[in-house]
């Protein structure tokens, strides 16, 4: 399908990273950087706060124009690419958990008439947590969300459904929820 649309398919890292423009979700590894050509454009989550100076010196030495997409703002000064990735990650995490439940325990994530719903504990009420919550509820799971931010919990409570239990992270409450959870 991609090749029919004009894309070239290759297994060669040198070919992939040797282009004028490289788009990559994760930052390139040291090995992958070797293949970047001078003056190429790299658009990636560079995770600047997790990298040392040498990483960026190497990019500079190769004269790579690196754009950290985690800092690209839209016209409303929102980090919309990061939000989008969080939305995708939240939804996919629940779909993946559903698949693992089915393969390992023979359980379904969704609610089935007469069967106790699967219990899902979500740690974090940010964008990823919001979309994980939406996906889990959509599949019929019983969901509980924990976060240390009261404002994030309020926001989630308003956006999702006031019937979804939310809680500040209290060690005793969290431990009880984790012991009962089918998915975390």
Predicted feature locations:
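Glycine-rich phosphate/diphosphate-binding loop of Rossmann-like nucleotide-binding domains
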Residues: 1, 104-183
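N-terminal beta-loop-helix "entrance" segment that forms/cooperates
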Residues: 1-8
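Short, well-ordered alpha-helix to beta-strand connector turns
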Residues: 6, 19-20, 39-40, 63, ...
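General beta-strand structural signal in soluble alpha/beta enzymes
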Residues: 9-11, 24, 44, 66-69, ...
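A short, aliphatic-rich alpha-helical micro-motif
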Residues: 14-17, 36, 175-182
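Short, well-ordered secondary-structure micro-motifs within conserved domains or adaptor modules
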Residues: 17-27
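Short glycine-/small-residue-rich Rossmann-like dinucleotide-binding loops
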Residues: 26-27, 46-47, 170, 182
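Glycine/serine-rich phosphate-binding loop and adjoining beta1-alpha1 elements at the start
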Residues: 30-119
